[in-house]
Swiss-Prot record:
This is Uncharacterized protein YjcH. Gene3D superfamilies: alpha/beta hydrolase (3.40.50.1820). InterPro entries: AB_hydrolase_fold (IPR029058), Esterase-like (IPR000801), Mycobacterial_A85_antigen (IPR050583). PANTHER family: ENTEROCHELIN ESTERASE-RELATED, IRON(III) ENTEROBACTIN ESTERASE.
Length: 240
């Protein structure tokens, strides 16, 4: 029997950190009940994870098989490619404000609106490319607020590597790290062509030393949703 479909709620609220109205996409599973507590999956690139990643469908199927704990998804869409870079890139003009938005505004919103666990292990950050970057960097800034990070082909630069090196209070984090073996010539949104594989290997070496629960999953593919979509399920099964 095919799993039932949950519901997607569109929630709007004004972010003081970003000084703009934010739209959130909240996925509640088909058997959602306020009588139970739920893990919260916070997805950067919210529209992409729902449409291209089909994350709602994958969570629903895992729940129907009882392969993950009860979970809701909060997707944070981006307005356009330029705005995405400004908020997700370590050198972006809104990067710091966006991290504060996640920690100081989105998390309290989720805890107020839904029956969540309200502790770090009950929150998972997930993102692809730059979305994975800002997920990791947010968790490094707020290590007690988040317990799990799923990184799909993260963009890694000197800022990311240095942040990991300087982070001493992250041993408790659980990280699932995916990168394609063919991501050697990735066309970025600012017009450059970058090798993602070598920086991710450097990141792997650092995280292996820092964490007790770290999974590195190379896959035979490149920087596309074609490869990321089927890799969401195994990551969720491990983290939830």
């Amino acid at each position: 029997m095919a799993p039932k479909n949950g519901t997607v709620q569109e929630k709007k609220f004004f972010s003081k950190e970003l000084n703009e109205e934010m739209t959130l996409l909240v996925y509640l599973p088909s058997n959602y009940s306020p009588l139970y507590k739920y893990h919260v999956i916070i997805a950067q690139d919210g529209h992409d994870y729902f449409r291209l990643g089909r994350i709602g469908r994958q969570v629903e199927e895992l729940l129907s098989k009882r392969e993950i704990d009860r979970s809701i998804i909060i997707g944070v869409p981006y307005k356009d490619v330029k705005e995405r870079r400004n908020t997700y890139h370590p050198e972006g003009s809104k990067f710091s404000a966006y991290k504060r938005f996640i920690a100081h505004e989105l998390v309290p919103f989720a805890d107020d609106e839904y029956p969540t666990y309200q502790i770090g292990y009950g929150r998972t950050l997930i993102g692809d490319s730059l979305g994975a970057t800002v997920s990791l960097m947010t968790a490094l800034d707020y290590p007690n607020m988040f317990g799990n990070i799923i990184m799909q082909s993260p963009y890694v630069d000197k800022h990311v590597l240095e942040a990991v090196k300087q982070s001493d209070d992250i041993k408790h984090l659980s990280i699932y790290h995916q990168i394609g073996t063919k991501e050697t010539d990735v066309h970025t949104t600012d017009g450059n062509i970058l090798d993602f594989t070598e920086p991710n290997r450097e990141l792997k070496q650092l995280l292996e030393k820092k964490l007790s629960d770290y999974d590195f999953e190379p896959f035979d593919g490149d920087h596309k949703w074609t490869y990321w979509q089927p890799l969401i399920t195994p990551a969720l099964k491990k983290m939830l």
